[in-house]
A protein has these predicted regions:
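Sec-dependent bacterial lipoprotein signal peptides
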Residues: 1-20
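Sec-type signal peptide cleavage vicinity
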Residues: 8, 19-260
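Active-site rim elements
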Residues: 238, 311-313, 382-383, 387, ...
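A short glycine-rich, aromatic-capped structural motif
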Residues: 266-320, 396-397, 404
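Short capping motifs at secondary-structure boundaries
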Residues: 288, 295, 300-308, 327-335, ...
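Functional-site microenvironments in short loops/helix caps that host divalent-cation chemistry
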Residues: 319-433, 459
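Surface-exposed intrinsically disordered loops and tails
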Residues: 381, 429-451
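Short, structured beta-strand segments at or near domain termini in extracellular proteins/domains
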Residues: 457-470
Length: 470
């Protein structure tokens, strides 16, 4: 027995001496074979830039490339070891080059499969979650390869753009809001998954006359791009060559005098129903957009899960039901819709900064702009009378409209009058912008505004949306 123990001890000493002659990388790997391991990595490859769009709008078939790296650059690598996935995070140092930390064991061999991703303008958290934004660049190679043997690791990858990119030219300091573009918001190496958002994107034109690039892709197949400024809104259906993967382009910010293929107004689609928002500038409380029409049955029902094409205004809905609808709409569009306040509604009804001082919303003749008791006995299709100065329809008559302003607990105001109102009750709200003269006529709309019980609903009462930019 003593001889056996002596032999075992001698063998252990020999193993220690043998390990001591190995490189530190290999020693580290042996010591950490069940935990995170770190080895040197040779990276063979490059980053491919974007196709540049020339001033003639024709795509120039040249690509900028880069093989230079900065301290702190990271490449996230998904190694495949047979059916096992090994996650790696490679970091660059100008002093020592690339090193990669990974959990698990790499397969030995060459031309082995891996995926590589490189990020610019991203935030790397301690939990290895990569936080991204509209200005983050993502380059990847889903068919990269690696070779590994005895602690020597080489990764070969050509990192290409995952998105397209676009910028807007205009006046320095001009602030714009963009809709219709989806961007990546996070990357989780642990599950090898990206998350995305189609929320409104805020950009500002810099001193060089353009905004920073937005990196993303069109949210839907319609390829509708919306731009909102401090006093305008435009929408454009973009060509198939715009914002494709690897494409770089630019567009001039449109104006009222020169907007070419842009449609005036912000067009939004929800549950297959498109509706238009009109910019309302000059309001003391800040710029907002108001729906061109009262909320239609088509929009309300479709967002709530029942397909409809009806262009009648929705009515017979309670205030809580309206709130639930708006929450669903915001979740779907990632925009910030709400009911207008009494002041916002009144300002828009009068024509905003384009007001002509009409008695009714858009005219001194009620029949030109309003459905009311003298010309109908039920609600009518929206947008069949003339609009007001801003291009907004039915702010006098058709159906009364909830606003967010509450008269007292559980009693929201109703503005605009409806089809059952007589002519004196469909005038715009008073120039004083106060509600001291509110009428208690309930759903008969005695006066330009009324109020109702919070959870009550009635035929002839609907609502209209506004959108604020955030």
């Amino acid at each position: 027995m003593k001889q056996v123990r002596i032999i075992q001890m001698l063998m252990a000493v020999v193993m220690v001496l043998a390990l001591g002659s190995c490189s530190s990388d290999i020693l580290s790997e042996v010591e950490n074979q069940n935990g995170k391991q770190t080895v040197k990595m040779e990276f063979v490859g490059k980053v491919i830039g974007f196709d540049q769009q020339g001033s003639s709008k024709a795509k120039v078939q040249t690509r900028a490339t880069s093989s230079s790296w900065k301290d702190g650059d990271k490449i996230y690598i998904t190694f495949y070891n047979g059916s096992t996935v090994v996650l790696g995070e490679a970091s660059y140092s100008s002093a020592s080059g690339w090193s990669v930390s990974y959990d698990g064991n790499l397969e030995t061999g060459s031309n082995l499969k891996c995926e590589a991703r490189y990020f610019v303008n991203a935030t790397f958290s301690s939990s290895s979650l990569v936080s991204l934004n509209a200005n983050s660049e993502i380059y990847e190679d889903l068919n990269a390869t690696y070779a590994y043997s005895n602690g020597s690791l080489t990764v070969t990858a050509t990192l290409s753009p995952k998105t397209g990119r676009i910028r807007f030219t205009g006046n320095s300091g001009e602030k714009i809001y963009t809709t219709g573009i989806s961007v990546y918001t996070t990357f989780s190496p642990a599950i090898n998954t990206f998350s995305t958002s189609n929320a409104m994107i805020t950009s500002t034109v810099t001193s060089d006359g353009s905004t920073p690039y937005i990196y993303g892709y069109f949210t839907d197949n319609d390829r509708n791009l919306g731009l909102v400024g401090s006093d305008y809104a435009f929408t454009r259906t973009c060509t198939s060559c715009m914002l494709n993967v690897g494409e770089s382009g630019y567009m001039a910010i449109p104006s009222e005098s020169s907007h070419n293929n842009w449609r005036s107004g912000l067009y939004v689609k929800a549950s297959g129903v498109e509706f238009k928002m009109i910019p309302v500038a000059g309001y003391s409380g800040g710029f907002f957009l108001m729906a061109e029409t009262e909320t239609t049955e088509a929009l309300y029902k479709s967002v709530n899960g029942t397909a409809s094409t009806s262009q009648l205004p929705i009515d017979d809905v309670s205030y809580p039901f309206v709130s639930t609808f708006i929450e669903k709409l915001n979740n779907e569009t990632k925009l910030s819709f709400s009911l207008p306040s009494a002041e916002q509604w009144s300002y828009a009804a009068k024509g905003g900064n384009k007001t002509q001082g009409y008695t009714y919303a858009g005219s001194n003749t009620p029949g030109d702009v309003a459905w009311y008791s003298a010309n109908c006995t039920s609600k009518q299709t929206v947008k069949t009378k003339a609009p007001n100065e801003l291009g907004i329809y039915d702010m006098s008559g058709n159906v009364g409209e909830f606003v967010s302003t509450i008269y007292s607990t559980y009693y929201p105001y109703i503005f605009g009058g409806g089809y059952c109102s007589n002519v004196s009750y469909i005038e715009k709200t008073s120039n004083s912008n106060t509600y001291s003269g509110y009428d208690k006529g309930g759903y008969n709309f005695g006066g330009s505004y009324s109020y109702s019980s919070y959870d009550c609903r009635s035929k002839g009462v609907g609502f209209r949306l506004i959108l604020t930019c955030k």
